[in-house]
């Protein structure tokens, strides 16, 4: 027998004593009593479990009364708190009617009929939103939570199930059995939240899982913001945003409340995004239509000014990864730079040689200090390539870390970026155009 372990057998006498002790103080219906012993037995509902426990207690109490270990008054009090089958036993013993007390937890309101009505209300909400895969959530009123906690604390039961869990499970099972909808704990289309007050009045609210689409976007024009940008005076600062554009194309087909975007960083509003594009996730909020074909979606969002291409469905994890890794992804920028003095080809060669695998120290740019903390960050520039445009202007391709403020790399930002192009060329420089050519995926 070496190495094998033998589980401790159930002490049925102890279980019945616990039931008696509990019912001597609290009136409990079958559902609520069974729930406090939920981890005993297999394949039983809490109602069946509670009824069985009361039957077992009835055997003990009849024997105790016959052996004069319990008196009439104590037996009557237990019958009042337990209800059937103890009330029937007492009525036969004493030829006296017993009026059972209402359940301390639910007031006797939990029943198969009540659960059926909740399941029907949940189904109606799911049907309105064309949801077939769902989960049930429960929010209890404070008074109910306190009662449940009081009883568990006083009894010390360790094999109990919460009221929330019972309602979630039983309602989910009934919706599946009666209406054919499938509980899906991995990828639910919606969560039906049953909100209960202390009188077990309920209402059902539906939290619809958004449709998430993974793709990339290109901005072919300038002065296009990520999200609507309002001026301090209340008017629009820029006429178009990527989020509004997508909402205008997708909200109606999906019958959605709104559309949001999550991108791997963001370029300046006056910058274009060319090349393979910037990764993003489109979040379609509270859609009543969930089925879609990716090719049809791409046709809806096709445009010359803002080009968005959806590749596949996304998850919340995809959004997290976009946010977490955007600073790690290297980028290539194209800048058109204007100088206050003539720039020679030799100076441009010097610039290329200097900005080769070099660390750049940047404080938060002055232009965004009103909305971001003033911190020092270090980013690397791996390579710079230049091409003269005129005697006082040139193009620069910059290959660098994500998170580098590339405009400030040009003009130094009053010494807050070091080193910078202006300090090496010893002249005043201004970036007049910026394009994002490549973002590491």
From Swiss-Prot:
- Enzyme Commission number(s): 5.4.99.25
**First-tier enzyme category under EC:** isomerase
The domain of life is Archaea
GO MF entries:
tRNA binding; tRNA pseudouridine(55) synthase activity
Stretch forming the signal peptide: none
SUPFAM superfamilies assigned: Pseudouridine synthase
Per UniProt, which keywords does this protein have? Isomerase, RNA-binding, tRNA processing
Active site positions:
268
One record GO biological process: tRNA pseudouridine synthesis
Annotated function: Responsible for synthesis of pseudouridine from uracil-54 and uracil-55 in the psi GC loop of transfer RNAs.
| Similarity comment: family membership | Belongs to the pseudouridine synthase Pus10 family.
Q: Would you tell me the protein name for this molecule?
A: tRNA pseudouridine synthase Pus10
Q: Which organism is it from?
A: Thermosphaera aggregans (strain DSM 11486 / M11TL)
The organism's lineage is: Archaea, Thermoproteota, Thermoprotei, Desulfurococcales, Desulfurococcaceae
What gene does this protein come from?
pus10
